[in-house]
Each structure stands twice: as structure tokens, then as C-alpha cells.
């Protein structure tokens, strides 16, 4: 299985294989997920102080905050899936 990476802004990268959901942070349930992750120490803030526009939830229950739009992250995710990087062995 190849490791595929997604740029989530400002040089930050997450593993595409570990992503469960990419959602907008405006709803109350997502705000609660962010708050719970912060309390548990499972929150990764990759916004560099900017407004949170996308919340990425991973299979390890980590929550990653990104300053780019969820649609942009999802587009990068789809493009990555269609054109995987060839690894030289």
C-alpha cells in the first residue's frame, strides 16, 4: 500500500490513507468534536493562527484543523487518489 499525502496548507501534510472525513467547522456537533479533541490532547491545529475552514478527522481519532476550504482539501484528496506518485524501489 502506497502512502499518499495531502497538503492541507502552509506546508502541512496529512496521510490520505488515514482520513475519515473532511468537514466544515460551523455546526455545533463539529465544534463539540473539536472541543473534545482539544480536551483529550488529540487536536492538531495547522491553521497558523488563521480562521479554521476545514476539520479533518482521522481514523486514529485525531482532529486536524486547516485554514483552507474543505472543498479544496477534498479536491486534493481526489487528485491524489487518481494520480499516485510512483515509488522507486
Swiss-Prot record:
Superkingdom of the organism of origin: Bacteria
Coiled-coil region(s): none
Pfam annotation, one family: RemA-like
Family of the protein in this entry: Belongs to the RemA family.
Protein name, per record: Putative regulatory protein MAE_11840
Organism: Microcystis aeruginosa (strain NIES-843 / IAM M-2473)
